[in-house]
Amino acid sequence: MRVSAGAFSDPRSLASIETLLCASPELVRLRFAHACCLEDLGRTHEAIAAYADVIEREAGHIGALTNLGCLLLERECADAAEPYLRAAVAAHPDDPVARVNLARLEAALGDLAAAIDAYDAVLAIRPDHVHAHLGLAALHERRGAPELARRHRTLAYARPRAWRYPYYGDMPPVRVLLLASASGGDVVSNLFFDERSVELSIVLADSVRRLDDVAAPDVVFNAIGDADRSAASLERARAICAGLGVPAINDPAAVARTGRVAIMHRLAGVAGVRVPRTERIARIDLRASTLAARGFTFPLLLRAPGHHAGMHFALVTTAGELAAVAATLPRDDLFAIEFVDVRDAAGDVRKYRVVAVDGRLYPVHLAIAREWKVHYFSAGMAESAAHRAEEARFIAEPAAVLGPAGMRALEAIVAALGLDYVGIDFAVDAAGRIVVFEANATMAVYHPPGEAMWAYRRPPIDAVIGAVRAMVAARASAVGSSA
């Protein structure tokens, strides 16, 4: 959980804050807002530096300590996050957000008992804290106490959990109801809604018992994107959408069919596409003989369901490593995933990302690295002008890079999934096939850093954001014209 200075969805907000900072560089609250805005816009490395600057000026700043710790924790850097999150609790012992994040830290460090104690401390301060109850539910499930887990989940959703954001426009707004899941795995959507044209309400779908619990919208945006992590939330979202009877972007029923194993089966017959074999296997059955019987060979990949950004995702090179690697991953079941070697002759791996909005494809980025697990933020693109030039070519002319067959394959994937907003992470193998790493509704887009070297990445991100905003407005207008 982070502390926010506001909801920043537009680079113009950053420019305004920076103008104010030039006039009043000593104001810590402005420096904190600057850091939050950088984070909201996806400029993570700059945000980390900006939060550190706030802490240097005000050592006990709850927002900077919390947000910097959370950024590091989300990147599996628990050791680096630890001093900040512990300092937040030390400086603000009665702050429930600080203690929730301490519980998350303890769990990441492997001390489940300490994590439970930290969540209990939150409930001593605020007995109805939804994230504390849900955190305890997850921990008690891991410890084999399903009744306790069920009790805390019931308490978490004892009342509707909804938030309405302020509207700053002059004309009647488009009223958007965003459905979210407390279990995580939602699409990062803050850039998609401009508070000058959209009145945004957010509700945790699991907490809704009656339609009267939510504000009447013009359109629903279902942000619940992880079918493996949030199946119950998607089912509740489906019922909400059916009851409201307004257009729903990313129909929950369609999202529910995008789990990793389901995607493998659904895309198996698509021409020009290769989807690595994927099976969900109970930890107790995770043996080399079981994997061999199911058609797996080494090396292979293990992944904990419901995690993204490379978290809890590991390469197993030999059967002898299987038990040790599996022991480092959470969950009682894991995905076993076929390892497809997509390195080129020089040893580089290319991971492309495209997003489809209302059926139209948009290039987002290309990350090039030597590691098998490629992520843009760790690929070292800033250090290679040649790699950035290659990415710029892909962004400018994806069809020229991927070829007609590659574009047809991507279009077929989008058509097969039937989502209004969907992302695809993929490589291209030696045969020219699209090798799908992920295809789902959780794909995020972020503005690039402010340096001139990244200027080529800004237009495609703006195009995606503009397309989503236009889609939302069009769906809302369709309701108004038919009324």
Task: Identify what each model region corresponds to.
Residues 165-172, 177-290:
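Conserved N-proximal alpha/beta basic substrate-recognition cap immediately N-terminal to
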Residues 277, 298-325:
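Glycine-rich phosphate-binding loop of ATP-grasp-fold ATP-dependent ligases
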Residues 314-409, 413:
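Phosphate-binding site of ATP-dependent enzymes
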Residues 415-419, 428-483:
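C-terminal active-site "lid" helix and adjoining low-complexity regulatory extension at the edge
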